[in-house]
């Protein structure tokens, strides 16, 4: 029987996580503001030259070349510099799409055009790929001689919706051939490296900063690369690296001033650089530098709160904390136990700290909406804990819905809007509060991916609130069958997400992109069933080194 004052967390087989190894390193990295200014000036000199390439007049072939250029800009991390030009080009080209694509028989070109138009919300039909299939509906075997074309088709297949059956065939066809290319080593090394990276995570679901860093290395090895474009991409990424390190310094100093490390139980994770990295997955552009610091603070708070709910609080303790958060009254802090009091004080401090900035811009509404989502989040966590430790057995569907809230789906989108300031309006918050199908699908995806990854550890820790566990019980299947079915659900959800991104035409593209970026965050964190947020080695270390430590040579 659980104690009414303290949950026996010491009885859990919970493995203590190491604290972040990166904080001291990034505090010691020097930043030269004069270098940052010099890079910015050179970028401003080159950008008009690229803009000329985008604004040139011409025929259908010219429009086609522009679309291919847009894909290069996306892959190199440069598209945000030219959003207005890209919008105009694609709107004009889509009106003439049949003329532009009609006689085109190059697999790579059609695949790239498909990706670009769908990325920007233009629903180019997947029937454009029928020209590459035989009478049996299968893709022609002769296509396998075109490695870049196959790779482009593989990327395009990840933008499929629930009715794009030809893209299901394309994914099966391309993935098997790309794996054969890796084994056979028949391509040049830089192409094989790109194939390996893409098979791990396609661009559709990878974080933009990683895409840019990897593609710059690939593009430089291409014999026909544009030297001006390559120079701009390198300068841009170097500028991003400088911004990122400055942000980390700001966040790490804030965390150190809190002085909370010695007060936390050993079960709590202090994932400092990791909390910032999760914010980077939501937006990588330099204009959202302040937003990433805001995101890091929220992520730190949410990580501590998650650990307290899962591994420390008794149900009565958590109930009192939830009540206190819902009242949001400073006086209520005196009703809480020690750790609860520290966490609630941290929440108050985070909101006060961020509130000073948004109120100065007349954006206090944004913080109010974020607070409302925090209240919903802590209530959902309480429900999960009651299910995990009590005798209640929710349905699989109920767990996925409530667990999607507890996973911070809605809260993460809200704090990303707060960090964007006036770049998004009230309609963005109202849209998320309406719980549209797109966001509910992402919440379900996150819950499923997290529970697939954590199933073994949840069970060994005695934490029953897991989708795999509930699916096994509800449908009387084995663990392996439950995992397979949940993995299929994730694949189907990705198609629904793609579909909703195309169908949702009343919401600004920047807001929709935040939803897509949350989907990317989930893929980065949980692909290959490897929870990189809680593992300081492996893929997480690779990302940190690639994005922040390895210099990009100008």
UniProtKB/Swiss-Prot annotation:
Induction: By wounding. Mg(2+) 3 binds at residues 450, 458. Mg(2+) 1 binds at residues 306, 310. One of its GO terms (cellular component) is cytoplasm. One of its GO terms (biological process) is diterpenoid biosynthetic process. GO terms for molecular function: (Z)-gamma-bisabolene synthase activity; cyclase activity; magnesium ion binding; terpene synthase activity. A motif (DDXXD motif) lies at residues 306-310. InterPro entries: Isoprenoid_synthase_dom_sf (IPR008949), Terpene_cyclase_plant_C1 (IPR044814), Terpene_synth_N (IPR001906), Terpene_synth_N_sf (IPR036965), Terpene_synthase-like (IPR050148), Terpene_synthase_metal-bd (IPR005630), Terpenoid_cyclase/PrenylTrfase (IPR008930). Its EC number is 4.2.3.40. Gene3D superfamilies: Farnesyl Diphosphate Synthase (1.10.600.10), Terpene synthase, N-terminal domain (1.50.10.130). Keywords: Cytoplasm, Lyase, Magnesium, Manganese, Metal-binding. Mg(2+) 2 binds at residues 306, 310. This is (Z)-gamma-bisabolene synthase 2.
């Amino acid at each position: 029987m659980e104690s009414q004052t303290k949950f026996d967390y010491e009885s859990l087989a919970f493995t203590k996580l190491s604290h972040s190894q990166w904080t001291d390193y990034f505090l010691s990295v020097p930043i030269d503001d004069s270098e940052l200014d010099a890079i910015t000036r050179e970028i401003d000199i080159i950008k008009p030259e690229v803009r000329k390439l985008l604004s040139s007049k011409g025929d259908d072939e010219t429009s086609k070349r522009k679309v291919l250029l847009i894909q290069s800009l996306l892959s190199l991390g440069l598209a945000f510099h030219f959003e207005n030009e890209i919008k105009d080009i694609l709107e004009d080209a889509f009106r003439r799409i049949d003329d532009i694509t009609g006689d085109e028989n190059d697999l790579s070109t059609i695949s790239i055009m498909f990706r670009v138009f769908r990325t920007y919300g233009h629903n180019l039909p997947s029937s454009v790929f029928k020209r590459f299939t035989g009478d049996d509906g299968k893709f022609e075997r002769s296509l396998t001689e075109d490695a870049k074309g196959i790779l482009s088709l593989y990327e395009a297949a990840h933008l499929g919706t629930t009715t794009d059956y030809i893209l299901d065939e394309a994914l099966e066809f391309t993935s098997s051939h790309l794996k054969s290319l890796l084994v056979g080593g028949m391509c040049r090394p830089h192409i094989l490296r790109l194939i390996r990276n893409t098979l791990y995570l396609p661009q559709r679901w990878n974080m933009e900063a990683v895409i840019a860093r990897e593609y710059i290395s690939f593009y430089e090895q291409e014999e026909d690369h544009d030297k001006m474009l390559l120079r701009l991409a390198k300068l841009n990424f170097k500028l991003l690296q400088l911004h990122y390190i400055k942000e980390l310094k700001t966040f790490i100093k804030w965390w150190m001033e809190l002085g909370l490390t010695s007060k936390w139980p050993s079960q709590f994770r202090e994932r400092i650089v990791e909390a910032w990295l999760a914010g980077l997955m939501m937006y990588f552009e330099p204009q959202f530098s302040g937003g990433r610091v805001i995101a890091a603070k929220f992520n730190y708070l949410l990580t501590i709160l998650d650990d307290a709910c899962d591994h420390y609080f008794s149900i009565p303790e958590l109930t009192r904390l939830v009540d206190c958060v819902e009242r949001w009254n400073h006086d209520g802090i005196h009703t809480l136990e020690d750790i609860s009091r520290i966490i609630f004080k941290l929440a108050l401090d985070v909101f006060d700290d961020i509130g000073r900035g948004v109120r100065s811009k007349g954006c206090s509404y944004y913080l109010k909406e974020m607070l409302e989502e925090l209240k919903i989040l802590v209530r959902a966590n309480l429900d999960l804990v009651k299910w995990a430790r009590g005798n209640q057995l929710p349905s699989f569907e109920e767990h996925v819905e409530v667990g999607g809230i507890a996973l911070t789906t809605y809260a993460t989108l809200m704090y990303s809007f707060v960090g964007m300031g006036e770049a998004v309006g009230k309609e963005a918050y109202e849209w998320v509060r309406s719980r549209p199908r797109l966001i509910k699908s992402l919440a379900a995806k996150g819950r499923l991916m997290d529970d697939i990854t954590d199933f073994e550890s949840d069970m060994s820790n005695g934490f029953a609130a897991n989708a795999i566990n509930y699916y096994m019980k509800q449908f009387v299947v084995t663990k392996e069958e439950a995992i397979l079915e949940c993995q299929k659900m994730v694949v189907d959800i990705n198609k629904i997400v793609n579909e909703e991104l195309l169908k949702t035409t009343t919401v600004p593209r920047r807001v929709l992109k935040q939803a897509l970026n949350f989907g990317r965050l989930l893929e980065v964190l949980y692909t290959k069933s490897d929870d990189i947020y809680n593992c300081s080695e492996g893929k997480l270390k690779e990302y940190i080194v690639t994005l922040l430590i390895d210099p990009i040579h100008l």
